[in-house]
Amino acid sequence: MESHCKWVLIIGIWALVADAAVNDTASLRQHRYDYGPFNGSLELATDVITSDTKRGEGSAVQLPHEPHLIRSSVIFGLTKVANESNVSPSCHNHLKLVQRGVLSKQPWAIKVLDASGTKPSGFVFGQNYWLGSREACHGVQRPVGITLSRHYERVMHYSILTQSAPFEMDYRVIYLRHRSPWQVEIKVMSEQVLHIGLCLPSSCGSEEVKQLTRDYVADSSFAEDDIFDMKPEVLYMKDLQLSANFFQRLTFRLVVAAILVTGALMVCAQQLRVVKGADDPDQGLAPVESELWQAMDSLLKREPVQKFVSCFDLANNWKKIAAMRPNQPGEIPIMNGLRSVCAIWILTFHVMWYMYFTVHNKTLLLSYAEQLFFQYVSTAPLLVDVFFTISGFLQTYNFLRNTKQLEAVRLNGLWGNVKLFGKLLFHRYLRLGPLYLVVMGSVDLAFAYIGDVSVFHINERFDELCPQYWWRNVLFIQNLFDHQEMCANWSWSLACDMQFFLLANIVLFIYAKQPKLAKGLTLSGLVATITWSYGIGITSKFEFSFDSTYLTGTQIYTSPFVRVLPYIVGAIAAWFFQEKGFQLEMSERRTRRYWHLSLKVFVGCIYATVKRDLGTLITISLFVLGRGLFSLTVCWMIVGSAAGTGVWWSRLLEAKFFQHLNRLSYAIYLLNPLVIALVYSLTNTSSAADPFLLSVVCCGFSIIVYLASIAFSLAFELPYSNLSSLLLKGKPKTS
């Protein structure tokens, strides 16, 4: 019994000791996280602010750090200039609560201050993104979802995770144009626009905040204006909310309708395939009780409708895209590789180009582009001439090989040739138009979306340009106008290609009847484009610098009168190859030398712009003659491949894989700027131009664009190509 009492006594003593230890630990833990009002409830925070308010609304007492905050923090400066005459009572009250919360170091108010933008370093080289943190502003409104153990000592105020603002806050961005002489002005797009992110009370309207900002920058309180002579001017403000008008846009309805109609046709094509593969084809498409399917069944029993619907057969179209077969006689396999590689190459350039409006070291980005190592990226626009050369070659080559059509042109009268010309134009438009128009509608929607929700100032507002100038794109004449007024301005080359197609067909029709006249017109066109290029280049003082290239874009870069040169060179090469029976009669060793020489000239033309301040005459000479030489090297590759010769690198370009990629090249060309611009604009922070990171980003964009191109090609390109073949030959074109 005594032993039992002894053990009870010992256990009781240990329990008391343990309880004391727990209390001490809890007390210590509470001490570690106890920072007076900082860790109190929201009511306590509000009480502190209220008591501070009662100490005097107009008190002249100023804390030591208050002048610094006024001049360095835009959000704090706005709280100081706010009064009852320039903002609503609720906005005024909430801004003053923010001000006093910052001065009394309330955690929620410090988070507001921290989430709002201030000037970062790098202004001289283009850092205009004072965005603060959108996520941190959201953290002011609601506790951050993170679990931290209290068993470890921390120096932080624990309530910065838990304490919320006593009223609604939201993140907005205000845009100011500056005129500072202390920032490198490149004159490529609109770079002198400050982006200032502000975590503001929701009670403050955008117009009120804009007026407060005007008062703040005009009051000499903006320290950065004193240092960098910014002379800021308020442009506009975004609340980063999607406009209610977005879903009312005509393009939204048209794109949705196109998707629904295409989807319905694909479903019908699939049902048709199932019925044809069934044991009893007369069974029909659907159960008897479904009136909709019965109506569809009766409609699809008509042979013309079946042929039309079969153009949208997803399985067949995928087989055509993915097919990789042996090269057929008369085909020129190197064209697949040239188109595919150049499409990805141009995509790489667009990654850099559309990075420009989100990068905060623009000067260094262009500096990298001028370095020798990165010339292959910065001169990628020259590769558009590869497509023009191939188009000119194929247009002439196919026309001259089609003896039946050639004879028809010779025998037809004027009206007969006009009808034939219209037929060719219709089929060209049918193959190119649907995907192009859907992408154009998608561009309008995408830029309307990012114009509302992106933190970045979007220089090229295609959602404003497309509703005004859509008809130019529909007619493929957008490149005849100012390049800054284009809807989807990267489509200028598609307009050029359509215009060259029309002109080439006119000359070829003339050639069928009067060969000498057609040859004279072709040579005259060649001389005219060279003369025009020299004249316009000298007049506009053209240089290879990026600012000069951008500002002379309408006169030179997108002008069909300048860009027609490689198309003519390709057409002449095709005429020599087809009509003159041009053959490569030389030794294998010499043939290899010419192949390698063509590659060296090709690369040399790419790197010819490494020095960009050579003077106008030398620059325009390099531009014109270099492009002519560049096109000749492409023609050599095409003719050499058609003749069956080649070397190791040309055999790589003739690989079967490029057949697949070539079928997607049109979609890749149309989609890559849209995808790249959309992804960049939806980020919440600016990025730095870093060569290694850029290479990784290029790989990522290549995969995304490739997958998007498959989807768009299956839906909006291949079905209409099948339809064109159906109308021409009576059945869809097979692989």
Description of each model-found segment:
Residues Q192, L240-A257, D297-E303, G330-N336, ...:
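Interfacial loop-to-helix transition and helix-capping segments at the boundaries
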Residues F312-K319, E654-F657, T685, D690-S695, ...:
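Membrane-proximal cytoplasmic C-terminal regulatory module of class A 7TM GPCRs
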Residues R563, Y567, A571-A573, Y594-L718:
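Alpha-helical transmembrane segments of multi-pass integral membrane proteins
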Residues L265, F393-R401, V439, V443, ...:
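Hydrophobic transmembrane alpha-helices
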Residues P201, F501-V527, F576-R593:
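Solvent-exposed interhelical
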Residues E2-G337, C342, F349-V384, F388, ...:
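Exoplasmic/lumenal regions adjacent to the first transmembrane segment
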Residues L254-Q270, D444, G525-G537, L597-K611, ...:
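Hydrophobic core of alpha-helical transmembrane segments in multi-pass integral membrane proteins
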Residues F252-T262, M335-C342, P381-V384, F388-I390, ...:
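Transmembrane alpha-helical segments and their boundary/interface "anchor" motifs
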